[in-house]
Amino acid sequence: MYPTHGLDTAFEVTFGKDGPLVVLCVEYDALPEIGHACGHNIIATCSIGAGLGLRNLVDQLGIRVKLLGTPAEEGGGGKIILLDNGAFEDAKCSMMIHPGPYDVANPTFSTIQQYKVEFFGKDAHAAGAPEEGINALDAQIQLFVNASTYRQQML
């Protein structure tokens, strides 16, 4: 664990040898007269905990995990400096955990939201006027293929 990517207070620790790289952002800040505020103590702790939890699973999962210390988050643009200096270069995805004003009995996670999607078509005679039809099944298949391809590229 050493300062890295142009920031003296940044660090990175990588687990695993082969496979797609998953970056866990360990966000922190030291604000004058406040210290670690805006949930950065929770963000850093959760990201480190997730990384340590994955440490013994990286070979089994076929991934690499990088814990990336991202300082200067309140106005300093720490992640921007890290991005400009290549810290996220090989990442297939990067994640972080952030506290918010949600009830733990009914949490909201944007990554697992459910959506109801309806496809509407328009009937047409295949021989008489096929150009007047709208095939809803084509749109549905396209959504499935694109969502599946996107998921495959994540890891």
Role assignments for model-derived ranges:
Residues G19-V23:
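Active-site beta-strand-loop-beta-strand hairpin of nuclease catalytic cores
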Residues M1-K17:
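A non-catalytic alpha/beta surface segment that caps or lines the substrate-entry region
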Residues T9-T14, D29-A37, N41-I42, I48, ...:
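Histidine/acidic-residue-rich, glycine-tolerant segments that coordinate divalent metal ions
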